[in-house]
Amino acid sequence: MIMIFGIPIQAFLGQLLIGLINGSFYAMLSLGLAIIFGMLRVINFAHGAQYMMGAFAGMLLLTWFGVNYWLALILAPVIVGITGIIVERFALRRLYNLDHLYGLLFTFGLALVIEGTFRYFYGSSGQPYATPKLLSGGVNLGFMYLPIYRGWVVIASMIVCIGTWLLIEKTRLGAYLRAATENPILVQSFGINVPLLLTLTYGLGSGLAALAGIMAAPIYQVSPLMGSNLIIVVFAIVVVGGMGSIMGAIVTGYALGIIEGLTKVFYPEASNIVIFVIMALVLLVRPAGLFGRDA
């Protein structure tokens, strides 16, 4: 039997793959969070609640209207994105010129309200969401049995992350968004509707969280607590990558997911804290994060 640092290679590769799967969700959630902070300078504590809303939207669309997974994969992010647009338009926009603390407190309170509402109606226990038939079954890789759905999650996550990065960094719309963040008055003087851009940006970030939520539903079950259990880890990932850095959020999300998975092989007791240890070390050496820009 082949060993790596005293660990059977099957266990090593298995946890490597599981870490990549978890990293796919970390990357998507970190991406939405980084977009909102990078463009709006808002620390969005409601991101975990929006992730949970995406999962519930998919489940309720199936339960109430018989909407299948593939259609819900489109509708759930749109629904949650629209709720994000409403929140930004009528509440969050009023806080932009104030200290960041106000936005953080507002979104933290919003997260508590959303989570409390869903807990009141659906309880705290998880509810199953069936894997679509097209993605049921699995593949024997030799070192582990990989469910096809989890392989799909990794591929879909990479496509979404790369596509979003290209949208922000390589398109005219992305250039407008970045310029509006740096100098909104100048951009508005060219006839560009900056408030609308900011509203759509928050809607995009919310929609990305919801997309991650519905993709996670068949794996982790649907629960009002699923977002609150994850959001602190995602914030740590964004800090390590660099607050507001799109590429930093993506790369760090995948990397720390893999590191967390491998830690479960070599030192399982530390697997729940390894991301926070890395965050502390990075902040000591590079306070702006690995991909962030120094102030």
Where are each of the predicted segments found?
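Membrane-interfacial amphipathic/re-entrant helices at transmembrane-helix boundaries
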Residues: 1-28, 57, 68-72, 98-102, ...
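Single transmembrane alpha-helix segments in multi-pass membrane proteins
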Residues: 11-64, 86, 90-98, 102, ...
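Hydrophobic core segments of alpha-helical transmembrane domains in multi-pass membrane transport
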Residues: 55, 59, 77-83, 110-118, ...
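Alpha-helical transmembrane segments within multi-pass membrane transporters and channels
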Residues: 66-110, 117, 251-256, 286-287
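Cytosolic-side transmembrane-helix boundaries in multi-pass membrane proteins
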Residues: 2, 11, 90, 121, ...
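Transmembrane helix-bundle core of multi-pass membrane transporters
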Residues: 2-5, 94-95, 99-170, 197, ...
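Transmembrane alpha-helical segments in multi-pass inner-membrane proteins
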Residues: 26, 66-78, 199-209, 213-214, ...
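Helix-loop-helix "hairpin" substructures at the membrane interface of multi-pass membrane proteins
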Residues: 22, 144-222, 246-252
